[in-house]
């Protein structure tokens, strides 16, 4: 006859002993099934002097593993390259590229600032680079603090990997900067091959 306490211990060993259950639960809670799944990295930006920058659409982007609040991250982007800002996203393929970049450089901390913020409790999100708000891929139920000053800045990879969330702007996160390639390439200059 098996005692009920023994069954509990046996279940604990089976579920937690291998670590697989905890890994699966963490992945479920995070909204993903396999963070390390292969993804398609974008091509290098190929602008001379800009290593670790990748071409995503018409911009070059770079991941920065230096947690800053939203405002400091935006200003840090501006110091890296003339005309640079926190990244804006305009189609799903570009969103996927950004996710791949984050996975490559910091697979254990996927949360990053995007260059989006809510304009004065209006419920309208804008990109810091002034580009059109023509794409969004929010986590279910987000943004959930519109018309307040609680969470006015946008992040990626909070609860569902590859999706967005509104968060408090003072929170420190890693981030991705972007600049328009044509702003750096001067007429007659050559791209690095």
State where each predicted segment sits:
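Extracellular, disulfide-bonded carbohydrate-recognition/adhesion ectodomains
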Residues: 1-193
